[in-house]
């Protein structure tokens, strides 16, 4: 019966591929439409002159989410790619000759905390025990709810557990109740950068990210993050999914409150159901006529977006000894940078930045005597983006990188590419050029997020980082599963 039912998935990011796989396993005929020339959405890859760069996500956290996804199909991540746990997980530079390596082993982590703030190892155990509880409740009972309405959360067992989730306490306050040393505070507040809000505006529930970071660890799929995309594409094709690349959806036509036609720049398709994994705002405002939109322009403009980013992909013809795979440069004032992202949006005066050098772990991503370096500066979304400004910031981060690490790279650059707001918009129709979707503030959590269901169209659902559960690769995998299960219910 299901073989007769056709589902079109718009977008081949993690959420779209996840939804496609779940639907295909249930016997639906699934076609994925992808506007770009490679699948994976933001997790695309750029290869040039022997260098290979992941252009989007670079952190592999929450390995259990990937294991659980592949287990739905009787598979394991190791059937498709080789995972390596990084040790140290990452390095933080607080200034010149002032760094912290974050160890994989918990005993060494406790030793490090104790050496920085005497007595803090006991606080760390207590803090991580609370974070583990939040992670297990959040990832087990909250995250798979489609959040159509508050009634899904009116469950006495869940309400009792919610009191321990610290929804109304800020992460900033929660961290400072346990730790005083500024270095430890920065270490524990850093993961919320992935959630797109400041620690004072992020619920303490999200200390679950500290459990993901410090206890579950930082991993790397050999070959790069795009290996996950390749794995999901292979799985999808094994399940019978058709993926059409270089195919952009230009219009969704509706008749009798159902999608009648999906018009692309190549052809017109019909489907029994549509799951939109492309940028939600773009689908809502650009692909649908006004009567069928979930939201107004005013609504979208009032959303708090997570940051965008200015990225630089740099290949050099020398080896580096004094950096790790993941490196965070916290040598400037976090508060000032946060204000310039969230309070008074502007190009930052002295930004924090992040550097990935995957060739430290993986010799397949750069020539033998070279390194591939990825620089990321978090920015307010919607800023004016031009080449002159990009160059100014490139010079700034290269100078600071060289000063702090003691490594000279300026004269060894053989490959360079920048990527920022205009590129996010052009490649992904990204609203305001955002990189990470909606900020995970309390007012944009669960049923306060843009709805997964279209209110006016019976056979259209949304998935991805602008709806539930939120930004990040593991949440996108989960979002696709939720959308697929909802679609199956609605099609039954």
Regions found by a protein language model. Name each.
Residues 3-136:
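N-terminal glycine-rich phosphate/pyrophosphate-binding loop and immediately adjacent elements
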Residues 57, 467-487:
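A conserved FAD-binding loop/helix module that cradles the flavin
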Residues 95-201:
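Rossmann-like flavin
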Residues 181-195, 350-354, 407-469:
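A glycine-rich dinucleotide-binding beta-alpha-beta segment and adjacent secondary-structure elements
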Residues 208-259:
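Helical element adjacent to the flavin cofactor pocket in flavoenzyme catalytic cores
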Residues 250-366:
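Mid-domain catalytic core of redox enzymes
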Residues 317-422:
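C-terminal segments that line or cap access tunnels to active or ligand-binding sites in enzymes
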């Amino acid at each position: 019966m299901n073989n007769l039912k056709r589902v079109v998935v718009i977008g081949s990011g993690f959420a779209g591929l996840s939804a496609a796989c779940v639907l295909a396993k249930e016997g639906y005929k699934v076609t994925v439409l992808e506007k770009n020339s490679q699948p994976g959405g933001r997790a695309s890859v750029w290869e040039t002159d022997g260098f290979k760069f992941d252009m989007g996500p670079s952190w592999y956290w929450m390995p259990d989410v990937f294991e659980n996804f592949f287990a739905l199909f009787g598979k394991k991540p190791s059937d498709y790619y080789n995972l390596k746990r990084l040790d140290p997980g990452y390095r933080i530079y607080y200034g010149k000759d002032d760094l912290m390596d974050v160890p994989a082993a918990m005993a060494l982590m406790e030793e490090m905390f104790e050496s920085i703030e005497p007595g803090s190892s006991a606080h760390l155990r207590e803090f991580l025990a609370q974070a583990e509880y939040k992670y297990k409740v959040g990832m087990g009972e909250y995250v798979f709810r489609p959040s159509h309405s508050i009634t899904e959360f009116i469950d006495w067992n869940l309400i009792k557990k919610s009191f321990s989730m610290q929804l109304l306490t800020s992460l900033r306050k929660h961290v400072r109740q346990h730790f005083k040393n500024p270095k430890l505070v920065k270490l524990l507040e850093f993961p919320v950068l992935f959630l797109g809000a400041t620690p004072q505006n992020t619920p303490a529930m999200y200390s679950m990210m500290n459990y993901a970071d410090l206890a579950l660890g930082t991993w790397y799929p050999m070959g790069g993050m795009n290996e996950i995309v390749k794995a999901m594409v292979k799985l999808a094709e094994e399940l019978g999914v058709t993926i059409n690349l270089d195919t952009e959806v230009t219009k969704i036509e509706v008749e009798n409150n159902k999608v009648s036609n999906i018009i692309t720049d190549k052809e017109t398709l019909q489907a029994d159901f549509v799951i939109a994994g492309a940028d939600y705002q773009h689908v809502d405002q650009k692909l649908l006529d006004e009567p069928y939109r979930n939201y107004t322009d005013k609504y979208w403009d009032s959303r708090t977006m997570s940051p965008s980013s200015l990225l630089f992909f740099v290949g050099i013809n020398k080896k580096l000894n004094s950096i790790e795979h993941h490196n965070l440069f916290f040598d400037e004032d976090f508060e000032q940078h946060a204000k310039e992202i969230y309070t008074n949006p502007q190009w930052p005066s002295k930004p924090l930045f992040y550097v990935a050098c995957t060739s430290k772990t993986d010799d397949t991503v750069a020539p033998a005597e070279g390194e591939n370096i990825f620089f990321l500066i978090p920015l307010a979304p919607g800023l004016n983006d031009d080449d002159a400004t990009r160059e100014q910031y490139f010079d700034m981060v290269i100078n600071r990188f060289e000063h702090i690490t003691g490594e000279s790279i300026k004269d060894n650059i053989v490959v360079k590419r920048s990527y920022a707001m205009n590129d996010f918009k052009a490649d992904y129709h990204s609203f305001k050029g955002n990189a990470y979707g909606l900020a995970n503030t309390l007012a944009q959590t669960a049923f306060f997020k843009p709805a997964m269901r279209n209110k006016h169209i019976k056979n259209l659902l949304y998935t991805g980082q602008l709806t539930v559960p939120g930004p990040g690769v593991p949440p996108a995998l989960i979002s696709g599963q939720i959308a697929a299960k909802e679609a199956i219910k609605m099609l039954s």
